[in-house]
Amino acid sequence: MDNKMFCFQCEQTVGCTGCTGKAGVCGKTADVAKLQDELTSALIGLARATDGDTPVNADTWRLMIKGLFTTVTNVSFNEKTIRELIDRVHAEKERLVPNCSSCGSRCGRNDDYDMNLLWNAQEDVRSLKSLILFGVRGMAAYAHHAMVLGYADEAVNRFFAKALFAIGEDWGMDELLPIVMEVGEKNLKCMALLDKANTESYGMPTPVTVPLTVEKGPFIVISGHDLHDLKLLLEQTKGKDVNIYTHGEMLPAHGYPELKKYSHLKGNFGTAWQNQQKEFAELPAPVLFTTNCLMPPKASYADRVFTTAVVSYPEMMHIGEDRDFTPVIEKALELGGYSEDKPFTGINGGNAVMTGFARSTVLGVADRVIEAVKSGAIRHLFLVGGCDGARPGRNYYTEFVKQTPADTVVLTLACGKYRFNDLDLGTIGGLPRLMDVGQCNDAYSAIQIAVALADAFGCGVNDLPLSMVLSWYEQKAVCILLTLLYLGIKNIRLGPTLPAFVSPNVLNYLVENFGIAPITMPEEDLKQLLK
């Protein structure tokens, strides 16, 4: 392979235009980027073949979902595993259309797609197709998490094929725009499915205070989003004097009754994903990555990094489908942890954070919230959440939350909350002013809260004293944004930059129809939103 690539799917892409050199800002090489394109090409070919005479099955959807999830930012940096996936996709297509490869007519009906056609398409077509592609990549992560718990939705699965098929067709804006909005619709179903999977498996989250101090002795840090992997790790470390600490998007796990019942699930280590290379440098413990966001490990801690599921990095120890975490546990015992309790703080100096304010908790006190809004005790609600990242300017979200008036409430979710989740904003009406709803997929909970409040007031969500101030980084943020647009939610503030893959005409459509606006200065945006 040559050393040129093209990728503009994440917020940190070079110059807000695209990564085109020997490596992306995320750390993936040009060869990995081109293999991800090849995998996507093969997945479009597989989607085309799902209309064949041979019926698709659960394995078809499982492979399609895994392939899409593998191409999400900061998931896989491993050429070998991506090549293996490409071979599996081709084998599955051959099963669905066994006579296609030997057919003499060469109609091209089930061929893999040439991704260069997408990257070089007319800019508005490229923009809409990119929204579809990146949206279903993000949605695939949620479908994958639900799938490992035994939950699936046929309509969601079939939409993956429909969306991929659309990307491969020579369609214009009129045909593509409805598919873009359908990504939002199907992602809502997918998030509802994952919410059901998590809550039926682990109980409904309840508020909990999570310490940031790491106790002395051996421990393991688990990062990512997969609660199933955490559950298995907790079971395998029971009675072994090895404590478990969450990291990044795993923090909300502490709110689930079936997870927090384990006494050795002790607390949370570190902050958001982009700080891992600094925070893990001298960590006397192994780190297990269950999903994104993995950054290329530094030599100072590379021997302590373990991956599982779709996460993969060359020469890192990978835990296979049997989920036998013995090597991770042995590494924890070998390293021994800290000799004394080690206090840590969040970005703003707090020594504990709270989580677990899912829809059941907030709606359980909805009468108090409604009365407080009616009486004027609560003037406004903000949803400030989304992905964190390394680009300068993300301190906007810290300053925005700090400046919210005392008669307002801040709901948050996803790893963007680490910018401010250790702040003490006090209480209002007996409730914390700052409430962590959960992981990025728990946007479903936030949506249910907003819809329930709108119903209680007899108005639409857009008529509530509610503003959404969102940060984005990767593809799960794309599918969540499309879900909000599908629901007709308007006047969202988005930052720290607008996506490079959104063309001026598509952006103009979003501005005119949904009132999307970039963030500016915290004090200016607050002034506008509180009008």
Report the location of each language-model feature.
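Electropositive, gly/pro-rich neighborhoods at or near active sites that engage anionic ligands
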Residues: 43-201
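Anaerobic metallocofactor- and corrinoid-dependent redox/one-carbon enzyme cores
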Residues: 2-32, 36, 41-44, 178-531
